[in-house]
Amino acid sequence: MSSPAPSTQAFSLKTRQPIPDEDALLTEEDRILKQATKGEDCTTRRRACKNCVCGRAELERKLEAEVLTMPPGGCGNCSKGDAFRCAGCPFLGQPAFDATEDGKVKLNLTDDV
């Protein structure tokens, strides 16, 4: 067996190129800060406005109804915790619970002292 032919380098580590000035890369248009206009609409808030006309309120109501009607997961690991739950589990992000409690979380409200 023969050794492979030496490859030619596409770059050299010995030559140093100067670091370009960041300010020289910007144009005058880039330097002008554009002020964002803030309006009173649903896009600036997390929830829909009281008098919502963009359709966000209807979408939120639809999503709430879907979440309430979600069936328990079919993998059987819903009660064990996030490490064991499947990707489509409706209990994802919630703490582990007893499987006989139907997804209700029991909090320990006693003092640790």
Curated annotation (Swiss-Prot):
Residue positions of motif Cx2C motif 1: 75-78
Region Fe-S binding site A, residue ranges: 42-54
Comp. bias (Polar residues): 1-15
Region annotation (Disordered) ranges: 1-22, 33-113
GO MF, one example: 4 iron, 4 sulfur cluster binding
Positions bound to [4Fe-4S] cluster: C75, C78, C86, C89
Pfam families named among the record's database cross-references: CIAPIN1
GO cellular component: mitochondrial intermembrane space
Keyword annotations of the record: 2Fe-2S, 4Fe-4S, Cytoplasm, Iron, Iron-sulfur, Metal-binding, Mitochondrion
Binding site for [2Fe-2S] cluster: C42, C49, C52, C54
Origin superkingdom: Eukaryota
Record region (Fe-S binding site B): 75-89
Cofactor: [2Fe-2S] cluster; [4Fe-4S] cluster
Major localization listed first in the record, in broad terms: cytoplasm
Subcellular location: Cytoplasm; Mitochondrion intermembrane space
Motif (Cx2C motif 2): 86-89
One GO term (biological process): iron-sulfur cluster assembly
Family recorded in the similarity comment: Belongs to the anamorsin family.
Function according to Swiss-Prot or TrEMBL: Component of the cytosolic iron-sulfur (Fe-S) protein assembly (CIA) machinery. Required for the maturation of extramitochondrial Fe-S proteins. Part of an electron transfer chain functioning in an early step of cytosolic Fe-S biogenesis, facilitating the de novo assembly of a [4Fe-4S] cluster on the cytosolic Fe-S scaffold complex. Electrons are transferred from NADPH via a FAD- and FMN-containing diflavin oxidoreductase.
Assembly: Monomer.
Domain notes: The C-terminal domain binds 2 Fe-S clusters but is otherwise mostly in an intrinsically disordered conformation. The twin Cx2C motifs are involved in the recognition by the mitochondrial MIA40-ERV1 disulfide relay system. The formation of 2 disulfide bonds in the Cx2C motifs through dithiol/disulfide exchange reactions effectively traps the protein in the mitochondrial intermembrane space.
Protein name: Anamorsin homolog
Organism: Leishmania major
Lineage: Eukaryota, Discoba, Euglenozoa, Kinetoplastea, Metakinetoplastina
